[in-house]
Structures are given as C-alpha cells and as structure tokens.
C-alpha cells in the first residue's frame, strides 16, 4: 500500500510502516500517482482527496486496462480534524501505543 498526502501526513504514514509520499500540490500528487501506477507493485494507493480534485477522471485515465492498484481517495488530516486538537489526538495516540507521553 502507498499513500500520497501532504508531506506531514505522508510522514505519519511512513512512521506507521507504510510507503508515504508527500505532495504539496495537485500537480505533484498527479505525477506521483502516475509514477506509482506505472511502476506497479501496489494493490492499493490512497490519495488525499484535497490533492486529487477529480478522482473519477484520474481513475478513468490512469487505470484504463488495469485492475490494480485500487485508487482510494481519503480525507487528509487537516480536513478530518478541522476544528479539533490534532496535536492532542496524536500525543494521546503515541502515549497509548508506546506508553510514554511525548510533548511535540
């Protein structure tokens, strides 16, 4: 599985053991997506929906004649936690996982 998201979110996925690729623009995300699809080796590629404004068109164009990878638009952390304490959530998640509170 590979994930294309903003650089901070991609880093989080890498820390979780997945292949995370950071993109700062829709053009950069599109280029990364094309590279990953052409290279092959992934059953699933998740893409931050903020970086893929027209997922249906991307799937149609990139996946013509291919079964894999499955392209999955996902909400980015910024959108998912809009108005919430992201730092507190991540700190609590780390504390539960490793048993220590880490102040970022």
UniProtKB/Swiss-Prot annotation:
Organism: Thermus thermophilus (strain ATCC 27634 / DSM 579 / HB8)
GO molecular function: ATP binding; proton-transporting ATP synthase activity, rotational mechanism; proton-transporting ATPase activity, rotational mechanism
Keywords of this entry: ATP synthesis, Hydrogen ion transport, Ion transport, Transport
Similarity-based family: Belongs to the V-ATPase F subunit family.
Function, as annotated: Produces ATP from ADP in the presence of a proton gradient across the membrane.
Alphabetized InterPro entries for the sequence: ATPase_V1-cplx_f_g_su (IPR008218), ATPase_V1-cplx_fsu_bac/arc (IPR022944), ATPase_V1_fsu_sf (IPR036906)
Disulfide bonds: none
A Gene Ontology BP annotation from the UniProt entry: proton motive force-driven plasma membrane ATP synthesis
Gene: atpF
UniProt name for this protein: V-type ATP synthase subunit F
